[in-house]
Amino acid sequence: MVRMKGARFASLVAVGMLGFGALAACGSDSEGGGTTAPESSGSTSESGAPEVTGKVGVILPDSKTSVRWETQDRPNLEAAFKAAGLESIIQNAEGSPDTFGQLCDQMITEGVNVLIETDLDPDSGKACIDKAKNAGIAVIDYDRLTLGGGADYYVSFDNVKVGALQGQGLIDALKAKGVTKGNIAFINGAATDNNATLFKQGYEQVIKDDGSFTVVGDQTGDWDPDTAGKVFDQFYAAHPDLVGLVTANDGMAGGVIARMKAAGVEGKILVTGQDATAEGLANVLQGYQAGTVFKDTSIEAKAAADLAIAIINGEDPTTIATGSVNDSELGVDVPSVLATPVWITADTVQDVVTAGQASAADICKGIEDLCSKYGVK
């Protein structure tokens, strides 16, 4: 259950929309390596940034399930921590629970004041939270709530709303094409990801309430493009009359669209997405994807930085929270900052570029005529 504080939530969204050792040596920043903000020597840096008052560690999950973690979240987190005057260590577990645990241990040893994590699964996430809390370190779950983990705070988007946007977006796109009934299917995120459960809750309810379409397939794509593509092949073989798919993110949508191209049905069977990646936005412009959910991660990153600095300064972080999310495993409400997602169609792709979360150069490569048509620049 999500409980919201309306005024503070509206303010946050309005502002946002306007605006270690061996493992670290394994790659550059863009490849998942660590980043550390330079320390200040005085009360402010030469650029006017506040003095570094503490250290924050961030563990990102991977770079395969979505490119957003490296192309959006990392730079936005770096910028938010720098603006807050916080030293930061940002690492990527690259899908490995063992690496996740090692990074957690390293950050605790490094003496971080706050640990921010996006779990790979509940077990590895909880293990890290337990170790951090035993060391007296506050923990913020970032984007995904670790069920049963006991994090102190949670920063994300309204994930049921994300799913509702996907379901309604598919319905609207199909009806705009004159398709008022037919068979559709779901390709969900990983079963171990609480967000995937919330997304499905949103789109399943919208599809049910509309009543126009029949769900004939419902499987996980495990946040993997290849797996999602294979699931589509199964659905299409059993139901060649499919008219649409709720596909939970842009990465999986890309895998599905690749298989659709092989079958010659790209654009005939519409899919949905999430994360507003360059690939996803290009697929939207080409008519392969009904739309994508834009989650402005600069809002999410700033909220995480605001919580971290409040914790470090001994202030009350709950005053920053916009509401709470229930951890059903523990039966407790976790103070949370939840931002509002936005549905993006071909007509609004430029909004993502304007927000600085994707570049026209990346989106428009090879489809310059479509970008010109829809004003993407």
Give the positions of each predicted feature.
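A residue-level marker of the well-folded mature domains of exported/periplasmic proteins
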Residues: 2-9, 13-14, 25-377
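Bacterial Sec-type N-terminal signal peptides, specifically the leucine/valine-rich hydrophobic h-region
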Residues: 20-23
